[in-house]
Structure formats: structure tokens, C-alpha cells
UniProtKB/Swiss-Prot annotation:
It comes from Cavia porcellus. The keyword Secreted applies. It comes from the Eukaryota. Transmembrane segments: none annotated. This is Neuromedin-U-9. GO terms for cellular component: extracellular region. The modification Asparagine amide is found at N9.
Amino acid sequence: GYFLFRPRN
């Protein structure tokens, strides 16, 4: 979802 905060999401 939020690659800015969660690289795997």
C-alpha cells in the first residue's frame, strides 16, 4: 500500500 513507509506493502 504505502511504499513510502512500508517497502513490502
